[in-house]
């Protein structure tokens, strides 16, 4: 049976360090604070918002939610962003995506202060990653993949890595991050021909396509390390990933579960970035 790469163990280790750092900030009368901007009332957004708030509360990180109409004018959004950028007590800003179609994504992302951009949405922060500089904020989900591999002592140097996702949220930044660790990377997507023949040759496969249990054992070899980023709902209403876990777990070397995998680390890294920002801005 495959080694199960539990993300909650990784998250727990990060939180232990955060507790110490937050305690030191409190001694200076600094309370880390996150501003969340949500446009509309999509159930997925509201659920994610509640999850973030709950996680923040456990570590004594303050949150402020700005509930905005989906038809908000770009001018009004930018005024709000300017106000949050100038608030000394607000250390991190997170804007839920995707944005309403009438808003210019590049303009919105560029409006976030670089030192408060805790999910690396600003083009200049992303550009830094594409230049190989991993010292600042990184997108939380790709960073979670790296942290899980690091925790379980999986060296990326020389590894062949296949990423099934080409978005700016996961696939593209993650590809640059693993390149910085001297891996060889292949990006696949919905138009890739004969995907199993590509993934089967890889040492590590990262999938983030959002299709419940689509990926079966024929995509992997017996030594494959499988990182399942997606959180889907199966036909029985249960959370699952892109990979059919029960079908695959006996056939590969290691695999992350869903839940208790990448998602738990992603949220914890958001908290870490808020604390990082509070320390830098203090």
Curated annotation (Swiss-Prot):
The GO annotation for biological process reads: L-histidine biosynthetic process; methionine biosynthetic process; purine nucleotide biosynthetic process; tetrahydrofolate interconversion
Q: Does the keyword Phosphoprotein apply?
A: no
**Where do the annotations place NADP(+) binding?**
165-167, 190, 231
Catalysed reactions listed for this entry: (6R)-5,10-methylene-5,6,7,8-tetrahydrofolate + NADP(+) = (6R)-5,10-methenyltetrahydrofolate + NADPH; (6R)-5,10-methenyltetrahydrofolate + H2O = (6R)-10-formyltetrahydrofolate + H(+)
What GO molecular-function term can you cite, just one?
Answer: methylenetetrahydrofolate dehydrogenase (NADP+) activity
Keyword Hydrolase (UniProt): yes
Ordered alphabetically, the record's keywords are: Amino-acid biosynthesis, Histidine biosynthesis, Hydrolase, Methionine biosynthesis, Multifunctional enzyme, NADP, One-carbon metabolism, Oxidoreductase, Purine biosynthesis
The Enzyme Commission number assigned here is 1.5.1.5, 3.5.4.9
Pathway assigned to this chain's UniProt record: One-carbon metabolism; tetrahydrofolate interconversion
Matches recorded under CDD domains: NAD_bind_m-THF_DH_Cyclohyd
Gene Ontology, cellular component aspect: cytosol
What does the function comment of this entry state?
A: Catalyzes the oxidation of 5,10-methylenetetrahydrofolate to 5,10-methenyltetrahydrofolate and then the hydrolysis of 5,10-methenyltetrahydrofolate to 10-formyltetrahydrofolate.
What protein family does this chain belong to?
A: Belongs to the tetrahydrofolate dehydrogenase/cyclohydrolase family.
Q: How does the annotation summarize its subunit structure?
A: Homodimer.
Question: What's this protein's name?
Answer: Bifunctional protein FolD
Lineage of producing organism: Bacteria, Bacillati, Bacillota, Clostridia, Eubacteriales
Q: Source gene?
A: folD
């Amino acid at each position: 049976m495959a080694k199960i790469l539990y993300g909650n163990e990784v998250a727990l280790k990060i939180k232990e360090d955060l507790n110490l750092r937050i305690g030191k900030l409190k001694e200076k009368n600094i309370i880390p604070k996150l501003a969340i901007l949500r446009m509309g009332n999509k159930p997925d957004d509201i659920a994610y918002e509640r999850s973030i708030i709950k996680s923040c509360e456990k570590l004594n990180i303050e949150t402020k939610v700005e509930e905005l109409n989906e038809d908000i004018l770009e001018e009004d959004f930018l005024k709000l962003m300017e106000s949050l950028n100038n608030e000394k007590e607000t250390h991190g800003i997170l804007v839920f995506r995707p944005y309403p179609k009438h808003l210019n994504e590049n303009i919105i992302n560029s409006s976030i202060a670089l030192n408060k951009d805790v999910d690396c949405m600003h083009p200049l922060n992303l550009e830094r990653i594409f230049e190989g500089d991993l010292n600042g904020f990184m997108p939380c989900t790709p960073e979670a993949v790296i942290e899980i591999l690091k925790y379980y002592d999986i060296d990326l140097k020389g590894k062949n890595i296949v990423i099934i996702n080409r978005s700016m949220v996961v696939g593209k930044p993650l590809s640059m991050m693993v390149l910085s660790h001297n891996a060889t990377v292949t990006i696949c997507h919905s138009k890739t021909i004969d995907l199993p023949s590509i993934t089967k040759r890889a040492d590590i496969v990262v999938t983030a396509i959002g299709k419940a249990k689509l990926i079966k054992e024929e995509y992997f070899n017996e030594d494959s390390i499988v990182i399942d980023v997606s959180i889907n709902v199966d036909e029985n209403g249960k959370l699952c990933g892109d990979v059919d876990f029960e079908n695959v777990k006996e056939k590969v070397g290691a695999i992350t579960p869903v839940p208790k995998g990448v998602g738990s680390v992603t949220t914890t890294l958001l908290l870490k970035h808020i604390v990082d920002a509070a320390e830098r801005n203090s």
